[in-house]
Amino acid sequence: MPRILRAHGKRARLAAILWTATLLGAPAIAGADLRLVPEPASVQEGAGRLPLGGGVTIAVGNDDEDRFAASLLADEIRDATGQSPRIVNGASGSIVLRREPSLTSAGDEGYRLEVKASGATVAARTAAGLFYGVQTLRQMIEPRGIPVATIEDRPALRWRGVHDDISRGPVPTLEALERRIATLAEFKVNLYALYSEQAIAYRTAPLVANPGGAFTPAELRALAAFARRHHVALLIEQQVFGHLDRLLSLESYKALAETPTSGALAPANANARALAESLLAEAATYSSAPFVHVGGDEMTDVGKGQSRDLVAARGVGAVYVDWLTDLDRTLAARGKRTMFWGDFVESHPELAAKLPKDAVAAVWDYSGRESFEARLATFRGAGIDVFVCPGATNWSRVFPNLATAIPNIRGLTREGQKKGALGELTCTWDDNGDALFGLCWYPVLFGAGAAWKSGDYDPEHFRLAFDWTFLRAPGHDAADAIAQVASAHTILQAVRPMDATIELSWLNPARGSLDRQLLAMIGAPALELRRTQEQAIEGAERARASARRNADQLDYVVFAARRLHAIGQRAILAERMKAYYKDALENQRAPDKSGRVLDRLNAILGLLVQGREQSALLRDEYQRLWLAENRPYWLGNVLAEFDRDLQVWSEKWDRLRVATVSFKNGAPLPSAEDMGFAP
């Protein structure tokens, strides 16, 4: 999957500026008392509230799924009011949850919710519909009661999902994934996709997985069972076309690669195809969704190595279709539909009509383009079902670039609905391994809202509802703080082609000339960058003070703000150290200026200590946040970057300390070039 960082043109920068200004400065929507995500199809607000004093009862039938939904509702009431509702069998209570087979307008996942001052009823045809009605009711509960309202609701898309890269860095703990799934289910997400290159410990291919970095069959089955209880299906994506560089570097598998340096299996190699079919056959047993995703993006190597003759004889398109068809047979025999990334077929549109008719194209596009119609037309015109797959734009960045992600999710999901898409997957990617899921809640939950609501989903409605629905906090301090963190991308794009990428956090003014040159580019907006991140931290802490749930997830927002703040600080330190050393050089030969020279040198030493301390604090916090959601696997690779950064600060401090002592003993100072303080 090409998670490519592209430079943004003037048009994109203008859109980013307008988006940020809108998010930070928009007034509250008049009359929007109900803060709900997703936004229901129909809401009629009334007057008054259903009180939740002592003696609240929740009436529900004997079905285990419905009683589980009732237990979540009881927990919500207890958390909001301190009261402990009773769950009773039957159809009489303060709140009634009931199946209503005649409610055909609700479809398979819709519901009807009616709240009166005397009681509330949630009705649905199915367990899923009742579950989703309860999630809406939970968001309506406040300590002073439930607002009177009538809601009729059903989803726009059958499948509403999140795509989680677990293969190139962070591997979540089972507990963290369960929490994600339970939280996403509150927002009516019903599909969770795990992207694996070698993050599954296959029984049939034990060399695939790295120790400590893979899910066992028992873990995947337990996760699927947990997800099922929350009406979420687990979708396994196992790359079998490419992105298998680590696997194909092993002696046991290197002969299966298209070329000696390729991460792609060779379609001309029977053993390569057998491996792919074996992996997918086992993956099908773990995927509780009706699909298995086979990958298949970025097929750039096929035909360059051992499949050259086959491709020359039949054409790369025919080779691709034959292989996909074989994989489709393997999965169909196990009751699964084949999902595949659509970019190769989009570049060869004549192949669409030759694809297996039950296959599903995952059409990804992470841009903020105005229209996505052409991206879907190739498949829909050939009668192929599609998933639309926008992106959280979190990859290789300190924080998701919301100025790209929100319009992308909004536009692609809206277009998918128009074209009859089967579902939506909001994609998170972990390129370079320095990625934390806790940073992604805002775009991921926006995707949930966009996939459920029919038509366009208003980002302003989402902003005003985010704090309440995710944190149970009044106001919109957290949403505003998130916008301020994300504004770093717009601030930095004003002076450089790229946005706030991870690479910026490793620029060190104590290192070489390239780092100093790049930091000099950031110097102009450094103060603005620091101010906005300080405001973000303050806003996040205000939200934390009133949050009743998920307050710990604000730690990720604050960490991103501190990391971005440090980038601005490093740009400032670079200029100060350069100026101080220049002043020291200019005055070192004046006998009456030795005190001034030492003051300047000591000031630089102090700045170096400041930079090192800041880096150490970020390292410790990063490690804590990583372990709060991930296994220790791979963490050492990121900590090594922090350690190298710390070493740079320390080595420069040591060198300058030697120069300072030497100066005190009569030696001249090294040149600015020699000390690394030159422009």
Model features per residue range: what roles?
Residues 2-17:
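Bacterial N-terminal signal peptides that target proteins for export
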Residues 15-26:
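Bacterial N-terminal signal peptides
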Residues 104-322, 326, 330-332, 339, ...:
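Feature activates predominantly on carbohydrate-active enzymes
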Residues 37-39, 44-45, 52, 106, ...:
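Substrate-binding groove of N-acetylhexosamine-processing glycoside hydrolases
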Residues 66-68, 201-204, 243-246, 302-304, ...:
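Extracytoplasmic/secreted cell-surface and envelope-processing proteins
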Residues 96-98, 162, 338-343:
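Short, hydrophobic beta-strand segments that form beta-sheet elements in well-ordered domains
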Residues 31-160, 411, 434:
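Contiguous, structured surface segment used for ligand recognition
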